[in-house]
């Protein structure tokens, strides 16, 4: 009997409140049920090192796919998004978007795509400059150390929150639980709509 493909996709970090979703218990639960787990680390990517495998503790504690946005990191403006996947998921012989660099052999009657995964799934001219920026930004983060970055972020976050909470016309969209969070936050500004309309006319 055919088993349907089940995919669970979750945010690692909320881009509104900064709350962090725990990966390990969810990875294990999803894999116990025979599904795939994909993590959207677009917000988390600039705050922590991506962790694809934590199998030393539990063999089910791994990500099937992870994607994030390096352009949110210092120095990586203009860099392409990154998709990291397990090799076992690349099952198609035809690339998702055939283009230059994906063809291995062509004749009048047939064609064959390359078996090199990174070439087969990246048709056309790559964003070379963006990829270099991404690599340099990741190198910088690794050089500084993720622990150091998180400590500095926490200092700046607390200083910022202290000032914002004192302002009468600023509402912080935050969760008052003790859940772990990053230095991401969102605010609303109290301002009467009628006044805006009058000032715009």
Regions found by a protein language model. Give the residues of each.
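Pyridoxal 5′-phosphate
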Residues: 1-201
């Amino acid at each position: 009997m055919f088993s349907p493909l089940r995919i669970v996709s979750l945010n690692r970090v909320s881009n509104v409140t900064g709350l962090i979703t725990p990966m390990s218990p969810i990875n294990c639960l999803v894999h116990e049920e025979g599904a795939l787990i994909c993590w959207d680390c677009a917000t988390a990517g600039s705050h922590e090192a991506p962790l694809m495998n934590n199998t030393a503790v539990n063999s089910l504690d791994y990500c099937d796919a992870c994607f994030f946005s390096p352009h949110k990191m210092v120095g990586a403006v203009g860099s392409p998004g990154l998709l990291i996947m397990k090799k076992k998921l690349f099952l198609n012989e035809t690339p998702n978007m055939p283009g230059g660099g994906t063809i291995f052999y062509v004749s009048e009657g047939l064609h064959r795509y390359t078996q090199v995964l990174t070439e087969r799934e990246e048709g056309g001219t790559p964003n070379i400059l963006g990829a270099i920026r991404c690599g340099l930004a990741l190198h910088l983060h690794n050089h500084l150390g993720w622990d150091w970055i998180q400590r500095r972020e926490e200092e700046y976050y607390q200083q910022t929150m202290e000032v914002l909470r004192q302002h009468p016309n600023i509402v912080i969209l935050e969760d008052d639980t003790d859940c772990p969070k990053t230095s991401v936050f969102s605010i609303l500004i109290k301002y009467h709509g009628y006044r805006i309309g009058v000032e715009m006319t």
